[in-house]
Amino acid sequence: VTRFQNQFLSAVKQLGWPEIEDLQNLESCNGAQRALRTISLDGQRQDTASRYLHPKLHDNSHPNLHVVVESQVIRVLVDDDRAVGVEFRRNPLFNKGDETSSRNRVVKARKTVVVSCGALGTPLVLERSGLGDPAVLERAGVPLVVSLPGVGHEYEDHQLNVYPYRSSLDPEDTLDALVGGRLDVGALIQNKDKILGWNAMDVTCKLRPNKEDIAALGPAFQKAWDRDFEQVPDRPLAMINPVNG
């Protein structure tokens, strides 16, 4: 817990926004939360691979778990409207000079195929598999398997505004010395300095404007609000993430 974290939460409470223990519960809005950490006390990132896959790969209890790295998914194989496998290849960027890298391989599924390639990658895999908007697939020369016009449709990245502020924070309460090169990164790693487990983000907010805010933003905003947000009370319009830079 940092001094800034407590001060920020105190300030937002004065504006009427409560502190919420889990702001990522898909329901809460108009509140603030202490930032959750994915860095362990020894400075190691606690990602999916290190916390889930690696332990199971080395516990000798999951012989059916195989992880294929440096590879690319080409498409999902579909038979009679059912996903039955995945076609993939070794990524040529990591296997230069290897003739086998150009050969496509197939893994069959007995139960389920899960496509989890992110907001940008997943639609591409589905479309290469023939699942998507017929017009898009026709232009790309991909045979239509299932008509799903919503695949990749109207995806919009979020907008970002950055505002710098002067503060009374002490130098050790920010990343300024690290970003400015005044700290020896090698020494920090060797000594497992706690600053390496901190991304300078201590708190986050999910917010929706009130009626006065909406009216002040003009008729175009009002129209967009009424269409996309008014009837969805758990959909935030903006997030605030202070960074102690």
For the regions a language model picked out, list residue spans one by one.
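Conserved redox-cofactor binding core of oxidoreductases
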Residues: 1-79, 83, 163-166, 174-180
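Non-transmembrane alpha-helical segments in soluble domains
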Residues: 9-13, 53-57, 126, 134, ...
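Secondary-structure transition/capping motifs at alpha-helix termini
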Residues: 59-63, 92-97, 101, 131-145
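Short, solvent-exposed loop/turn and secondary-structure capping segments
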Residues: 78-79, 98-99, 124-128, 137-139, ...
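Short acidic, glycine-rich loop/turn motifs
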Residues: 87-99, 207-213
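Mid-to-C-terminal "cap/lid" subdomains and adjacent gly/pro-rich loops that border
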Residues: 123, 133-245
